[in-house]
C-alpha cells in the first residue's frame, strides 16, 4: 500500500482536528442532536447506503413492516454518528461523566474485577452495538485493567490521535509480529481483554448460526480464553434515554480438561454468538447494519 505524502498526512490530520474542535465547542446533548439530524438526512433524504442496508434488514426481519425497518436503519446510523461524537470527546469523558451516563457502570466494573481477581484474566466480547467503545472507556475509567487490539492507521498523525482517544485503555497493535504473544502475556498477568466477536473473517474458521444465516467468524478470542483458562464475559452495549446500558448476557468458561483446544474454542464462540444473536433481535436498532464487511456474506473456499 502506497505511503501517504506529508501534504496528505497534514491535510487529513488538521481537517480532523478542525472538525473535532467544533464538536468539542458545543454542548454534548446539542452535538448528539446534530448527529441524529445528520443521520436522519443521510438515511431519509439522501438514501445513503439505503438499498444495501434495507436489503439486509428485510432478509433478517421479513415479518417487520417497511416503516419499522426504516426506523431501525435510521437509529442504527444515528448511533454510528453519535458514537463518533463520543469518540471525539473521549478525553473529556471523566468518571463523573460515566456516573451520569453509564447505567450501573461501577457495578459492572466490580463484577468484571471479580473475574480479573481470579488471576487468569478475562475475555470480554462486546459486538458492534450501541457505542461499543463506551464499554471499554467506562470500565477502564472505573479502574479495570483493560486492553484491546486496534489496527494501525495509515496516517501516523491520526494514528497517534486515535491512541490518545483510547485514554485509559492499553492498545496492542494488530498485525505486528508480537501481537499474539502480547495478548497471551497480558491475560496471564490477569488483565481484561476487550474484543469484537461479530466480524466476518475471510478465511474459513468457525461457522455460526447468526441472524437467520451462516456467519464465518474468528475463534481467536475464545482460543486465548482456552489457552489461559480465562472466563469469557459476553455483553452488549445499547442506548436508552440518553444513557449507555451495559447488558451482561452471560459468562462462559472453557473446559480445562478439553483435549481439542480448537474444538473447545469453536464451542465457546458459537455459544457467545448465540447470546449476541438473541439480543440483536430484541434491539436491532442498536446494531451496526452499515458495516461494509457484511457478516453473512459467504466465504469463498
Where do the model's predicted regions map?
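Soluble or luminal CAZymes and related metallo-dependent hydrolases
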Residues: 14, 49, 104, 175, ...
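Non-catalytic C-terminal accessory region of glycerolipid acyltransferases
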Residues: 3-7, 74, 114-117, 141-144, ...
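Membrane-anchoring hydrophobic helices of lipid-metabolizing enzymes
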Residues: 2-126
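Short, flexible loop segments at the rims of nucleotide/cofactor-binding pockets, characterized by
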Residues: 97-103, 169-174, 210-212, 258
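Hydrophobic alpha-helical segments typical of transmembrane helices
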Residues: 18, 30, 53-56, 158-162, ...
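A conditional alpha-helix N-cap/helix-loop micro-motif detector
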Residues: 102-105, 129, 155, 173-177, ...
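Catalytic core of membrane glycerolipid acyltransferases/transacylases, capturing the structured
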Residues: 118-176, 200-206
Amino acid at each position: 500500500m502506497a505511503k501517504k505524502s506529508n501534504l496528505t498526512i497534514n491535510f487529513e490530520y488538521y481537517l480532523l482536528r478542525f472538525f473535532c474542535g467544533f464538536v468539542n465547542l458545543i454542548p454534548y446533548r446539542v452535538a448528539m442532536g446534530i448527529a441524529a439530524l445528520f443521520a436522519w438526512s443521510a438515511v431519509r433524504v439522501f438514501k445513503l447506503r439505503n438499498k444495501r442496508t434495507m436489503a439486509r434488514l428485510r432478509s433478517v426481519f421479513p415479518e417487520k413492516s417497511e416503516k419499522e425497518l426504516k426506523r431501525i436503519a435510521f437509529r442504527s446510523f444515528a448511533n454510528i454518528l453519535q458514537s463518533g461524537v463520543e469518540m471525539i470527546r473521549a478525553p473529556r469523558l471523566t468518571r463523573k461523566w460515566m456516573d451520569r451516563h453509564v447505567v450501573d457502570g461501577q457495578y459492572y466494573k466490580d463484577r468484571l474485577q471479580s473475574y480479573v481477581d481470579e488471576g487468569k484474566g478475562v475475555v470480554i466480547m462486546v459486538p458492534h452495538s450501541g457505542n461499543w467503545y463506551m464499554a471499554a472507556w467506562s470500565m477502564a475509567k472505573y479502574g479495570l485493567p483493560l486492553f484491546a487490539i486496534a489496527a494501525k492507521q495509515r496516517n501516523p498523525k491520526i494514528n497517534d490521535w486515535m491512541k490518545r482517544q483510547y485514554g485509559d485503555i492499553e492498545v496492542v497493535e494488530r498485525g505486528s509480529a508480537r501481537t499474539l504473544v502480547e495478548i497471551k502475556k497480558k491475560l496471564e498477568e490477569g488483565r481484561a481483554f476487550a474484543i469484537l466477536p461479530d466480524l466476518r473473517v475471510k478465511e474459513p474458521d468457525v461457522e455460526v448460526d447468526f441472524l437467520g444465516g451462516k456467519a464465518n467468524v474468528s475463534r481467536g478470542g475464545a482460543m486465548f480464553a482456552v489457552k489461559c483458562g480465562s472466563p469469557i464475559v459476553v455483553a452488549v452495549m445499547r442506548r436508552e434515554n440518553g444513557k449507555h446500558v451495559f447488558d451482561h448476557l452471560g459468562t462462559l468458561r472453557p473446559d480445562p480438561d478439553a483435549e481439542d483446544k480448537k474444538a473447545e474454542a469453536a464451542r465457546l464462540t458459537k455459544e457467545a454468538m448465540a447470546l449476541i444473536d438473541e439480543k440483536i433481535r430484541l434491539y436491532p436498532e442498536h446494531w451496526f447494519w452499515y458495516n461494509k464487511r457484511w457478516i453473512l456474506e459467504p466465504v469463498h473456499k
